[in-house]
């Protein structure tokens, strides 16, 4: 059953409600950049695009390095002979991770489905299915436009022998990122695509399936292709993909009783972020990070060329961590694997320790094409460490730090910050000079409030981990953390963005407001409010999409819910129709499929509406949401190995425990009354909505 209106068409659920997770349209956007993307942790493309990308496969030296374009065999468009005018619909089903194109006429229905297999990450596939309507018998032919050319500007492609009916090409990237650096070889097998498929007169229905396997070894490509063929023969290729997506959604969902566009935005954001993470149950998955435009984007000159920024660690990571800590760990492992490059970056700039690149690709060396960002936008190093800190407090996974390289990274970052600080005799505190803050309108400034606060947090975390592991804490870490300057105007009671900032000066994006969240820098609520009031009117209206999400979190913290709602509503000008693809700037400029903006928006709900805050000892909650939302449900919150479901209304809160391996279990503690509720697996608790926290219950006998 479906409803139509304004060129869009929505799926209607059994209860008569439109399904917020299914986006359908009778036409495609005129700008092809706004087409839906289908990706998994290894492969990605935009539908109807002639290229695909492989995670971690870049071509080009230093600032020229970009995702290597690989010709896409899944770039196929279904058409019908002239004279036939079927009803046409295009659908992105975020529940199943599948894009489909449907042609319906009085005599037949033809459907084209395309997907990147979520659990068999080396596979992309598409199918064509034709159903005959009752009372018809003539042959039905659907034409397939497949403009595939086995060429690439980034790979030295050669043809190999066919394998199990598949064509085979392989080739190495042309230019390494650094001299002597890796030049991966890509191997691709694909089912040849005919010019047309025909449902013969004696057939009622038929499906044709087409497979593409991509890997960095011939052996893996062939193994994956054979596995795909076996699933096809068993009729389970697509169903195994949709089962993987169903399991993902069971362990992670955000829904609410409120406006449909808000619900759709949440499903869209989660779909595009979940598409990027390793499949569940694959520890050790060799992950290559998440770029602002995702794996589908990042060809030369597009979407920051597929490089990884703070967007991953600050904007995307917290959402992944809250639901899937194993996937969050894979993101951190990418930073650990590129630590060697970060050590060299610091050394080249004359500092100790590790300086993470503003733009990172395969090696951790700086690949930003403009020197100033790599030299001055150094808050990235603290942003990386904050992700490690959030992970540590959420999971208590000591193995990552003790044996898997985490501690080496933490201590190297602490060394970097100490070496980057200089003592000011005049002010009797440490300065960090000559930086570019998150607000990129300003550079070569001293004592960026955000940069210095994130450096302080890095040092405090490093000292805390050292104490946990009984490692002597260098006195320098403690001193630098204690005495680093975070600019504060005691008269106006607000944080100037940097030394010499004049109130009213324009700001590109959220900067000082990030002190409150995610940094949780200690401050009085009056100061938090003043920072919001000071910077909101001077922040660029059409700036990056995550900006207003962070202002919204601030106002929600202060319980000014309607003010928060007004700011969150601004985000909708960055969401495009019909597939909910985000653009970086509201005027349509900048990166497309902007996962960073989606991450910020999700945080506004996941950490703003709920009041979730990850601290050293607990997971705090303090709900507040605007009047047009009557109920919020967050399924699959992960904390210390447990899985929780929060159902929140303005009057009542319910926490259900779906998994709790801990003994003693977790408990919920209310802030004001001190009331405690043990959280046992399979049970739920409820209480009047109030602030509180989830923490480990004290051991019996203590």
Swiss-Prot record:
TM annotation in the entry: none
One Gene Ontology biological process: carbohydrate metabolic process
Keywords: Glycosidase, Hydrolase
Gene Ontology cellular component annotations, sorted alphabetically: cytosol
Positions of the catalytic residues: 440 (proton donor)
Recorded superkingdom: Eukaryota
EC annotation from Swiss-Prot or TrEMBL: 3.2.1.107
Molecular-function annotations in GO: protein-glucosylgalactosylhydroxylysine glucosidase activity
Residues engaged in binding substrate: 310-311, 508-509
Catalytic reaction list: (5R)-5-O-[alpha-D-glucosyl-(1->2)-beta-D-galactosyl]-5-hydroxy-L-lysyl-[collagen] + H2O = (5R)-5-O-(beta-D-galactosyl)-5-hydroxy-L-lysyl-[collagen] + D-glucose
UniProt record similarity statement: Belongs to the glycosyl hydrolase 65 family.
Annotated function: Catalyzes the hydrolysis of glucose from the disaccharide unit linked to hydroxylysine residues of collagen and collagen-like proteins.
Record protein name field: Protein-glucosylgalactosylhydroxylysine glucosidase
